[in-house]
Amino acid sequence: MKHTAISERAKEEISSIRVGTSCKIVLVSPDDIPYIWESVEPHLEAMEPHSEGELAPEDFYEAIHNGEMQLWLAVEGKELLASMVTQIVTYPRKTILRIISIGGDNMEKWLGYIPLIEDWALSMGCTSLECWGRKGWLKVLKDWKCSYHIITKDLTSRMH
């Protein structure tokens, strides 16, 4: 399935879902990225120190704008509480929704939307979720498990 088809299906499936009484989750249309990016970018910049340098905010911008990734926002009134970037990944034997970046404030207000993201993932043909994150996420994502660890070694010092 092409990413553009995923983007079109995404727009059909969800535009805004209420979470609780005061917070809602919004799947942002790729066309709207230029208009909201300035508000979202600080959440994605906060992720960088916890990564291995795979992606920077400008990389997210391009991938979301091109429909290769999805941007979700948790908002309360006019306040942006959190931003999350996902990507549908097709492996040879399964399709998953990968949470690549998630961060913001007042987690207790927006964490409850995860089951709605799960429903959206199912509607997109995904059979599971995968999250790139720190170990601390396991404390709040109670029904998730640590499937494996990714270990890394930096080789840039050996490059000529």
Task: Label every model-predicted segment.
Residues 59-61, 87, 136:
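Short, solvent-exposed loop/turn elements at beta->coil junctions and helix N-caps
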Residues 92-143:
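Acyl-donor binding region in acyl/amide transferases
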Residues 66-107:
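Conserved donor-binding loop and adjoining core beta-sheet/short helix segment
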Residues 50-69:
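Active-site rim helix/loop that mediates acceptor-substrate recognition in acyltransferases
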Residues 22, 96, 148:
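A residue-level signal for beta-strand positions that form part of recognition/binding surfaces
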Residues 64, 76, 119-121:
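Structural motif
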Residues 2-10, 131-160:
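Active-site/acyl-donor-binding loops of N-acyltransferases
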Residues 2-55:
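Short amphipathic alpha-helix that is part of the acyltransferase structural core
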